[in-house]
């Protein structure tokens, strides 16, 4: 028997025993190269991720300091998933989910599946059961630091439980990974930062739960709080910086900058002005911003107010940015948000911008 026939026989036997799709040639189906995504709800982050959102069938880790915007990012992803008709689940190990804030960010809280487990084992088992059901599109676990092992909860204060949480995460992820891929579910772990003791050189910061999550994650996002945004003398929000420190589906190390406004969420208008000015979709001359030769505001705040009031122009600018920065996902596609038929968007790319920046 030739090698080719022996291989075909083996492939056929594997498919018969384990089911269709258990093994295949990478070029057998075009779909193998197309990754399903759930948009992040933030244009700059979709661009930084390289594929227009979070990849489905993968594990994502979002980590950062307290109050840096980690939970906000996951709630925005849940809102986008629900807008596409998907089902979302939130495993609230921290017991800190605010339904009012989630609703403010666009989450359909009435249809959001929520669990508040007592132990880390229970939380991960619930997540695994949801994934295996195949009926959930996104599962968020908030957070790894709050996944307390049962032995620690039942023990006394001060008892030593070295490496218990790390072993729990390692065991759970080995079990979860195959199920996540099979069901094409997006699973997001929120994680916190701790300081290593005795580190003299290099970064002393590390994440909780051991190293397993770092290895199993296809994408790792580091969230940092930037400067404050002021409305007069009052602080109305702060800048958020998200760095893609690991990416298995696109080039890593891209960064997304955007504004988080207290009581409102992510400022879409600020994103459009920053990205529009960077890629010459919006012209900037001194403090003035213009679109198609028409002045829209003096200074960023006035321009943001203009775009809030003029939604048609805002949607047109958004579409132009998406078509320029994510052409594979948005170019030549009909959309309810796109300008009316017959109108053309002319985009002039800044010649100083390299092709790498457009990815």
Swiss-Prot record:
GO cellular component: cytosol
Localization of this protein: Cytoplasm
UniProtKB keywords: ATP-binding, Cytoplasm, DNA damage, DNA recombination, DNA repair, DNA-binding, Nucleotide-binding, SOS response
InterPro entries: AAA+_ATPase, DNA_recomb/repair_RecA, DNA_recomb/repair_RecA_CS, P-loop_NTPase, RecA-like_C, RecA-like_N, RecA_ATP-bd, RecA_C_sf
Binding residue positions for ATP: 64-71
GO MF, one example: single-stranded DNA binding
Translocase among keywords: no
This protein's record includes keyword Signal: no
A Pfam family assignment: RecA
GO terms classed as biological process: DNA recombination; DNA repair; SOS response
Residue spans of biased composition, Basic and acidic residues class: 331-344
Superkingdom: Bacteria
Region (Disordered): 329-359
Protein family (similarity comment): Belongs to the RecA family.
The protein's role, per its UniProt record: Can catalyze the hydrolysis of ATP in the presence of single-stranded DNA, the ATP-dependent uptake of single-stranded DNA by duplex DNA, and the ATP-dependent hybridization of homologous single-stranded DNAs. It interacts with LexA causing its activation and leading to its autocatalytic cleavage.
Protein name: Protein RecA
Protein species of origin: Francisella tularensis subsp. holarctica (strain LVS)
């Amino acid at each position: 028997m030739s090698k080719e026939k022996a291989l075909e026989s083996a492939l056929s036997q594997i498919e018969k025993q384990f089911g269709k799709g258990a093994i295949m040639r990478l070029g057998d189906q075009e779909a193998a190269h197309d990754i399903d995504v759930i948009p992040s709800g933030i244009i700059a982050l979709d661009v930084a991720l390289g594929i227009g959102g979070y990849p489905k069938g993968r594990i994502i880790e979002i980590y950062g300091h307290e109050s840096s915007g980690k939970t906000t990012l996951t709630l925005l992803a849940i809102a986008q998933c629900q807008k596409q008709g998907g089902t979302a689940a939130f495993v609230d190990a921290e017991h800190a989910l605010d339904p009012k804030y989630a609703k403010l960010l666009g989450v359909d809280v009435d249809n959001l599946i929520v669990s508040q487990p007592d132990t880390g084992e229970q939380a991960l088992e619930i997540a695994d059961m949801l994934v295996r059901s195949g009926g959930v599109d996104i599962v968020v676990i908030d957070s790894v630091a709050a996944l307390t092992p049962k032995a620690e909860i039942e023990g006394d204060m001060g008892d030593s439980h070295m490496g218990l949480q790390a072993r729990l995460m390692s065991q759970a992820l080995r079990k979860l990974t195959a199920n996540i891929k099979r069901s094409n579910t997006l699973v997001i772990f929120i994680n916190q930062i701790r300081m290593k003791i005795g580190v003299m050189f290099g970064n002393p910061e590390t994440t909780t739960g051991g190293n397993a999550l770092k290895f199993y994650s296809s994408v790792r996002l580091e969230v940092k709080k930037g400067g404050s945004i002021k409305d007069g003398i009052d602080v109305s929000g702060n800048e958020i910086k998200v760095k893609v420190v690991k990416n298995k589906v696109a080039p890593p190390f891209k960064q997304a900058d955007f504004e988080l406004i207290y009581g409102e969420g992510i400022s879409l208008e600020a994103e459009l002005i920053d990205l529009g000015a960077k890629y010459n979709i919006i012209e900037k001359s001194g403090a003035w911003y213009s679109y198609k030769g028409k002045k829209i505001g003096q200074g960023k705040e006035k321009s943001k107010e203009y775009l809030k009031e003029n939604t048609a122009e805002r949607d047109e600018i958004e579409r132009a940015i998406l078509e320029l920065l994510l052409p594979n996902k948005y170019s030549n596609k009909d959309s309810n948000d796109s300008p009316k038929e017959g109108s053309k968007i002319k985009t002039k790319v800044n010649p100083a911008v390299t092709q790498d920046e457009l990815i």
